[in-house]
Amino acid sequence: MGKYRTYPFFHDRSNVFQYNKEKNEYETIAYEKNNQILAASIDTLGTLWIAGPNGITRIYLPSNRKEPLKLPDGNDVITSLVIDHEGIVWMGSLGIIYAYNPQKNHFVIYNEMDGVLPNDFLAKPVLVASDGNIYMGGSEGLVRINKALKSASIPPPITLELQEVSLNGT
């Protein structure tokens, strides 16, 4: 699921572990007793992102502070999670992909109108490629998010065209 400092992190259905090479042992970092872990990832700043049936939780490992993340559309179920090279958290749900920028506290939602076909995204088939593209797989296929294409934050200008001119009724 990722690395923080020099430690690789792993998860099962209720625990997140870090592997300590020096001690040759796994240490439990987070335990989700009442919330099954569907997907998890860790960023370079030490924020652990855990997706479960009751929503997203982020744990700041340096301070051990834990807080929920509310999705803008009220959805609670995230089944796929990956963090790109820029720190954007990509989350897959039923037919929707969320891109969350934690620095700006800003969401972008991608759905069928953006080319994301209905898909039940899965936790394991996720990849951030060396070129920055994001790949998220599900039961209905694979989605590639081309990071070279930037979404327009400013809508294109409206252009008006004259269709007909009438002078004194003619």
Question: Model features per residue range: what roles?
Answer:
Residues M1-R5, I42-L45, I83-E86, V128-D131:
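Residue-level detector of Asp-centered blade-edge/turn motifs that repeat once per structural unit
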Residues K3, H11-R13:
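Short, compositionally biased segments
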Residues Y7-F10, T47-I50, I88-M91, N133-M136:
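Conserved beta-propeller blade signature
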Residues F17-Y19:
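Surface-exposed loop/turn elements that mediate protein-protein interactions on large endomembrane-trafficking
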Residues I29-L38, N54, E67-V82, G92-T170:
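Residue-level "micro-hotspots" composed of small/polar
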